[in-house]
Structure formats: C-alpha cells, structure tokens
Amino acid sequence: MSSSRKQARLDAKSNIESLSVQPYPNSKKIYIDGSRPDIRVPMREISLADSLVGGTKENPTLIPNEPIQVYDTSGVYTDPNYDIDVYQGLPKLRERWIEDRTDTEMLKGVSSVYSQERLSDETLDELRYGNLPTIRRAKKGQCVTQLHYARQGIITPEMEYIAIRENMGRQKFADEQLNHQHPGHSFGANLPKEITPEFVRNEVAEGRAIIPANINHPEAEPMIIGRNFLIKVNANIGNSSVSSSIEEEVEKLVWSTRWGGDTVMDLSTGRNIHETREWILRNSPVPIGTVPMYQALEKVNGVAENLNWEVMRDTLIEQAEQGVDYFTIHAGLLLRYVPMTAKRVTGIVSRGGSIIAKWCLAHHQESFLYTHFREICEICAKYDVSLSLGDGLRPGSIADANDEAQFAELRTLGELTKVAWEYDVQVIIEGPGHVPMHMIKENMDEQLKHCHEAPFYTLGPLTTDIAPGYDHITSGIGAAMIGWYGCAMLCYVTPKEHLGLPNKEDVKIGLITYKLAAHAGDLAKGHPGAQIRDNALSKARFEFRWEDQFNLSLDPITAREFHDETLPQESGKVAHFCSMCGPKFCSMKISQEVREYAKDTEQVALDQAINIKMLDDPLEGMRQKSAEFKASGSELYHPAVDAEPVKS
C-alpha cells in the first residue's frame, strides 16, 4: 500500500472512531410520533429568524417565522441524544416490528458456504465487524415481503412510518405565502394532498412502489420508492482493486446519508467485499443495494466464463443474510440481444451487462440469472430483498440512446417483473444511461408501458458526452427531466464519472446535484408541499435574512462560504445587499424601498396631487420630485425601515 493510501485509511479510521453528532446549522432533529410508541419518524427542523415588517432601528416591528421541516436521511448521526459507536452499530429500529409478525425464525448460523469460510478464517479477525447479529429467515411456507403484507391488506408499521415521513409535517403550515404552489404537470402520477398509510399500502400492493427493507437490516429507517412519492436519490460507494478501504467506505456511507442519500449501493469490487458490506450494513440508516454479480465474479478470480448458478446462489444467500435490501440483477440480457450492440459506438458499458454478455457468448446459452430467475425470487421472498432489474444494455453514449438492444431488454425486464410479483417480491426497473434531452421522455413512456408501472430507477441520464469532469451536471439535467416524467429514484453521478473512484467531496457534490434534480422534478410534478422550502428561502432572501438563506439551502456550508468570500464580516450577515450588486444596485433592496413607498398613504396622496398638477403643468411633477430628492440629502438609497416621505 502506498504511503498516501495508507494515510487516507488512517485518516478515515480516525474519523469514524471519533464520529460525533454533527447537526446542520440552526437545525435540530425532531421526531413525529405514530400510533405506537416505537414509531418515531425523524425530520430536520430548520429554525428561522423573525421578519422585520416596520418600526425603526431602535424599535423594530418583528413577526416570527415558523420553522421549516425537511426530509432527513441522516439517521442518529445528527441526533444529539445518541452516542455514536460504529463498533456497536445503529439501533435496531424495526426489530420489534419484525418479531411481532411471528413469521420469521432465527438461524443458528450463516447458511452461505462462503460466509462460513470467512467466519472461520482467523486472519480476518482484525477486519471483521465484531457485533454480528443473529440472522433471520422466513419460516417455512411464509413470505415476509412488504408486498405480501400489502396484498393481504395489512398496513405494517413500516407503511405508517413512511406516510408520516412523506408528508414532512406540511399540514401544520397555515401561512398562505409558504403554501403557495404552482400547478404541476404530473404525467399521470397520482399525488394526493396527504399521504396516508392506506395509500402507501395500496401503492405497494399494486407494484407501483417498493419498501426496500430486508428483515436482516432492522437498522434501516423505512422509506419508499415510487413515482407517486417524493423522488429519491441513490449514492454509490464501494472499494476497487486499486483504491479505498473499509474505513473509507464507512466514512463515505455516513457522509452520503448526511447529504441526502435515500439509499446507498455498495459496489465494491476489491478485497474483503464481505467484511466491508457488514460494516456498512450495521451502520446504515438507509437501505443498502448491491450488484451480487461483482462479488460472484471475485469468487471465480475474475473469469466471467467460470461463473455458474451455484456460486451466484451462494452469493445471494450470503448477502441476503447480511441484510442487503435490494439486488441489481441483470437477468433481462438475453443471448439474442448481444448482436444488437455490435454497431454501437460504445458497445456494452454496464459492468454487470458485459459480464453476462461474455458468459452467454462463451456458453452460447441464456444466462443462469435468466434461467434461474424463479429461484432468485424464492430467495428474495425469504428475506424481503427487493429486485432492481438491471439494464445491462443501457446506452453508454448519446449515439446509442433508445436503440433496439436497449428497448428489447426493457421489454424482457417487464416480463420478469410479473414473474417476481408471482412470489410477492418487490421490483424496480433500472434505466439509462446516456440520452439526449429530446429522447428522454420516450424512455419513461416505454418503461411505464412494458413494465406495468413498476418504479423506474435511472443513472442520470447524461444528456451530452462532451463534459468529463462535469458529468454530475450533464446527468443532473436529464435526471431532473426524467424525474418530472415519473422516474421514482435517481442514481447520482459524481464529477469523477468515467474518470476515477469518487472521494468524499465528489460524493457530496453528486448528492447535492441530484437532490436538486429530484426537488426540481417534484416541483414540476406538482408534488404537494414541494414548494414550501423554496417559498421560505425566497422570503428570507427578499428580507435579507442571510443566515436563513444559508440554512434553508441544500448545502448551507457552501452557501455561507461563497457569501463570506467577499463579505466575511458579521455585518455582511445583516447587510441589505451582497457583493454581486453592491449596496447601490441591489434589486431586492430597491424593490423593498418601492414597496415601502407604495404603502405610505401620505405619499400616495401626495403623488395624486402631483399628478393633478401635471395635467396643468407637465414639468411641475418633475420639479417637486427634484426638490424631494435634494431635501432627503441627495442620497440615492435609504434603509427601507428608515425611509420617510418628504413633505413639500
């Protein structure tokens, strides 16, 4: 290991060992209670300063602003009442709910052969997570998926939790200005003003939404993915053969949840994948997804042709028993689709897709993922692992967008969706990729048509190929658009896309970009309450409440840093201008003065008198305004609260 890599690992180890609660500025963790004592739904509440509405500097008239509640994915990492210890893991939030259903059993040990081998290897003791939980599995003849419960008409605690979470406490806002919202264009999405537990249950039962919630990941806070809910964002982390360590990946996990990652995928392809994943799961408040194929390939020393169902089956069980909430499975890539990619500019760019394509050609038969798909569903049903049906033939360049190969695979994914639903296994569909703006909607339309309204989950799409280093932007454009059209979850892209493994700062930039895209999509759809935060920030901006502007933003730290680069003094936090326009050309400051001016009845009466005089002498009004300006000291701008009409 190089000295720089060793130092990065040591720094990460130090960081996770000394993790302390780091709340957002002027925010606090609150909990909204449900129907039972153990349903406590976290929100982040942002406190706001009062609005100045009149008076003088010495005796101002103030009106309080209600705090704003926002969706929170950070778990206990922002709860000051919790002592963080990554060696003990997170509280098992859902453990009691799972026990109460009495349809699971505790296993005496791990079922996977590979897991048994890892546990018996003493050389891994230093790496291994020490507080391993007891494994659960469905009792014989039982199905433990949220889809199964929903179809039985059962509203689970998870569903109630989600209903509270999706509403974000917006019912309490009475302020007409905050509640103002433009009508959206939902493209057929059903967006009720209030999300109820029954609505959640019905959406899951119909297959339009999933609750990724493995019974072996009770630490995860329940969330939902579906086009009739808030658009979600996934963050990818994971080591490679040349970069990163367990400590760095745990650090990136915590970092991802802080900046709004609704789910996290561990895409590790390097050493110690099993141990890395255990550390991540035990410390993750959000659902964790994987691509099991990556680890299966490592087990056969990276030779795709040597993969087989036995290795894959053992890997699925291994990961399900650890607690992985959803698997990406590239089962829709069929042998006959591979030649369709021959004339592509960029061929097959999906790692999982290329592995399967190579295996299919080497054996000249359909992949074991396709031929054993029903067995995959049986495994998932025992642990409530959701399936994310992977798009192994997604376009890797805009030249290849919406081609025959891509849509042929999509239709097969729709067929597999119906098979998974036979086993009450939850399903989402993965999508592209690289697609120019004018071709994006066709992807959403085709997915809804062929995949029976199962939730769509896309990587971007990237709308142009000319910006390596800025692909978080090229893809953020496409993500906002497809989110508006109905995509349920967006997989983030970082500035390092196509260039290298992202570091912490890249993860943050990718997440902020995609939270922005998701929010823009929610606004465009007309999701109820989506505009409240925008309205609160705009009001703060107009009133020059700088701290509130920072704190209401997606990234308060960067917003404050940018402001302070040019106005670092504390006086800059109360100034009625910023460095963009300066004190004399601030449009909002001038607008405030105009508003105050218009409010003054004496001034209105005076102007009316001037207007009458102007009928007799058009220059009289000009002369009077000139006199007013000189009498006020010939100053172009005055503080809005001090402005007094000059009497002639």
Swiss-Prot record:
One BP annotation, GO: thiamine biosynthetic process
Domain of life the protein comes from: Bacteria
One Pfam family it belongs to: ThiC_Rad_SAM
Reaction(s) the record says it catalyses: 5-amino-1-(5-phospho-beta-D-ribosyl)imidazole + S-adenosyl-L-methionine = 4-amino-2-methyl-5-(phosphooxymethyl)pyrimidine + CO + 5'-deoxyadenosine + formate + L-methionine + 3 H(+)
Molecular-function GO terms, alphabetical: 4 iron, 4 sulfur cluster binding; carbon-carbon lyase activity; zinc ion binding
Listed cofactors: [4Fe-4S] cluster
Keyword Iron: yes
Entry's cofactor comment: Binds 1 [4Fe-4S] cluster per subunit. The cluster is coordinated with 3 cysteines and an exchangeable S-adenosyl-L-methionine.
Transmembrane region(s): none
Pathway: Cofactor biosynthesis; thiamine diphosphate biosynthesis
UniProt GO cellular component terms: cytosol
Binding positions (Zn(2+)): 434, 498
Keywords: 4Fe-4S, Iron, Iron-sulfur, Lyase, Metal-binding, S-adenosyl-L-methionine, Thiamine biosynthesis, Zinc
EC number(s) stated in the UniProt entry for this protein: 4.1.99.17
Residues that, per the record, bind substrate: 236, 265, 294, 330, 350-352, 391-394, 430, 457
Binding site for [4Fe-4S] cluster: 578, 581, 586
Assembly mode: Homodimer.
Annotated family: Belongs to the ThiC family.
NCBIfam families, sorted: PRK09284.1, PRK13352.1, thiC
Function: Catalyzes the synthesis of the hydroxymethylpyrimidine phosphate (HMP-P) moiety of thiamine from aminoimidazole ribotide (AIR) in a radical S-adenosyl-L-methionine (SAM)-dependent reaction.
Protein name: Phosphomethylpyrimidine synthase
Organism expressing this protein natively: Aliivibrio salmonicida (strain LFI1238)
